[in-house]
């Protein structure tokens, strides 16, 4: 795929040091965020810098490098990694890990729109376990995040949840007298401009858990937030597990700082306990091997075959799209030739699309109802996981039950077949396991038998998974010690988090 138009790079040029810039993903009051790739490793990265008009000595410029330092010092796999930082054309920049998936706020919002349901409680608890693990690591290195919220929990079906955006984070020693953050997830003391410490992150995590489960912030207005007599508006608990969850989250949302949990270590264990009780325990029971090229995960059949995808019988066909939406090569060209130029015209009318996005158009004269244009890769750089998640959510939003998909990004963008299959199938598995999806069949259609066999092998591994352990290994018997029935045997389940 070609690089993004120069206009989207906002004067940064084609590259910063070893990073080739694709284009701008978004911007805030003082900062801009770009998608790029390492020129040698071909891995996607996120580059954050300040807007061109912001002076190099400004608060915003200082924060970019401060964010890089704070992220880099936190030793946790649950924190988005800082990979590089420095100055470029008198502008500070931060290079950070790209998480190939969507954030929890988008996942929750789109499920509610498409399916009329939010996230299952087990998933909320697992996400919060990861968030608390990240925050605990931050606190143990003296860092207070100060902006914990669903949109800062970045989820990859392959690697799990990571906490990101440390843009207003501060060290414990300097976290004082500054009102910054997102009001809906901000504790009262932070809103008042008082000194804040890790207790602010305990509140932020509680507000995030509340929002992920119930689709709204715990307080509807600033007045409610500041009123010490106003409690979070929990709906009636539907189960003992949910009552347990509400008790835990309620303690995190205590307006009196002294009554909140002192840290997130015990909170993390409680989330682990709830998630462990509720999660479908053994994913092997949800996987059915139908035949060599057909599997079933829960109620969704996944079938893989060779052939021409343009003739697929499906409600929607996914196209491996480029960011400018032209359909002149690969699967896109085949769909345009069979379905008509109207498909390309509709896609291009929406303008260039960012990597990882997915856009729906009509299907022209194809048998399907829609074509879903998944912008999944660029020059060996894969965003296939994020694009697949959005394609699946879009299919649910459109009410589709059957999809036909190619191997995304493996053509002009040169993503390997294994990389593609892993990203697509882990995204599909998560989509199905979360529950509620309308999808009942996904047909993977490839041209070449050799490629199909490679894809099939990875797909089975991803869809089958390794299951949860049926037993707990508590260690080998001690040598030369007589086993006695009155001896103590204890497994401390509080020390085992969700897998």
PLM regions and their residue ranges:
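Conserved N-lobe ATP-binding subsite of Hanks-type protein kinase domains
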Residues: 32
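AlphaC helix of the eukaryotic protein kinase fold
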Residues: 51-73
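Activation-segment/catalytic-loop signature of the eukaryotic protein kinase fold
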Residues: 85
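Conserved short submotifs of the Hanks-type protein kinase catalytic core
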Residues: 89-103
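Activation segment signature within eukaryotic-like protein kinase domains
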Residues: 127-128
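Protein kinase catalytic-loop region centered on the HRD/HxD motif
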Residues: 133-143
